Swiss-Prot record:
NCBIfam families: PRK00364.1-6, PRK00364.2-2. InterPro entries: Chaperonin_GroES (IPR020818), Chaperonin_GroES_sf (IPR037124), GroES-like_sf (IPR011032). GO terms for biological process: chaperone cofactor-dependent protein refolding. GO terms for cellular component: cytoplasm. Heptamer of 7 subunits arranged in a ring. Interacts with the chaperonin GroEL. GO terms for molecular function: ATP binding; metal ion binding; protein folding chaperone; protein-folding chaperone binding; unfolded protein binding. This is Co-chaperonin GroES. It is found in: Cytoplasm.
Amino acid sequence: MAAVSLSVSTVKPLGDRVFVKVSASEKRPRRLYFPDTAKEKPQVGEVVALGAGKRNDDGSRQELEVKVGDLLLYSKYAGTDVKLGTEEYVLLSEKDILAMVG
């Protein structure tokens, strides 16, 4: 089996999934209040890659509401955590996104 080298540019989310770079707590927007319990696991991140969108019953794609570069607030235990080098990412379904920030 050949070794696969993962980087942000090689990760292509499928369907309605969104690949998000997790923001360090000190980079969080100051205008948002996060209770102490939310500081355990970051819930804010920047979109770095998108899937093509959810497939509808008729075969067409439903466009995602977010775009690369958007800052998001997402569910605390949502998605799959991915570490590439020293950076942390999370692969989310669009339904796990709570809000766009900024």
